[in-house]
């Protein structure tokens, strides 16, 4: 599938995701309780479901290259407070328990500039007493741009460029308890993609880059 040019503007091949990103942060109300907003709520629901399906299709196509990875459930199109949430994510679990660090695909950005990041992380609500220790072993692996860190400091996620200096800094901050957890991430553009194949090729290259970080979280690397 190729980009379609229309009246001087390009239509993204991920048109459902692009359309739903516009609605980020809106409040969803059950159509039966929405009164005169009923049609708007039905539109929100339709766009949310379509975007989620489009994202899930990409995830499934990617997962076919890695049949040993098991797909966890894709995030919903709204959160528990019924706020529209277009930045979907999907974990891909390898061997081991669901508490283990794993791969995840996560949407990011806005309608004009969006993409999907591949990351090594874990599911917070399923973590155990060893999850954080295993996750932070990603700092044992040498890093280079465009891979980057996302570190949680005082409950806030902060991005750090993938440099040796930042690797050493974050390692020290983890030891002193200033940093709780560190993810490694690699962004892949979707907004300007011209084909699904292009995106999948890029994601496979990204996976190759991140595998050493994932392997560092395994029991084999315990010291």
Regions found by a protein language model. Name each.
Residues 56-86, 92:
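Short N-terminal edge-element motif at the start of the domain
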Residues 5-40, 121-223:
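Charged, low-complexity intrinsically disordered regions
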Residues 12-15, 45-46, 87-94, 162-164:
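Short, mixed-charge, low-aromatic patches
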């Amino acid at each position: 599938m190729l980009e379609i040019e229309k009246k001087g503007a390009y239509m993204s091949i991920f048109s459902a995701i692009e359309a739903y990103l516009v609605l980020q942060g809106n409040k969803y109300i059950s159509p039966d309780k929405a009164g005169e907003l009923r049609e708007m709520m039905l539109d929100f629901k339709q766009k949310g479901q379509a975007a989620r399906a489009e994202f899930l299709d990409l995830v499934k196509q990617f997962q076919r290259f890695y049949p040993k990875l098991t797909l966890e459930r894709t995030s919903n199109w709204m959160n528990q407070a019924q706020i529209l949430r277009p930045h979907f994510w999907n974990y891909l679990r390898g061997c081991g328990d669901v508490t283990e660090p794993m791969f995840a695909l996560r949407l990011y950005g806005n309608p004009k500039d969006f993409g999907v990041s591949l990351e090594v992380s874990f599911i917070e609500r399923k973590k155990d007493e060893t999850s954080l220790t295993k996750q932070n072993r990603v700092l044992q692996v040498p890093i280079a741009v465009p891979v980057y860190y996302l570190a949680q400091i005082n409950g806030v996620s902060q991005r750090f460029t993938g440099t040796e200096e930042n690797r050493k800094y974050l390692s020290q901050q983890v030891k002193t308890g200033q940093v709780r957890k560190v993810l490694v991430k690699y962004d892949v553009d979707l907004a300007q993609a011209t084909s699904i194949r292009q995106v999948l090729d890029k994601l496979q290259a990204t996976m190759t880059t991140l595998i050493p970080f994932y392997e560092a979280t395994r029991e084999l690397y315990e010291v």
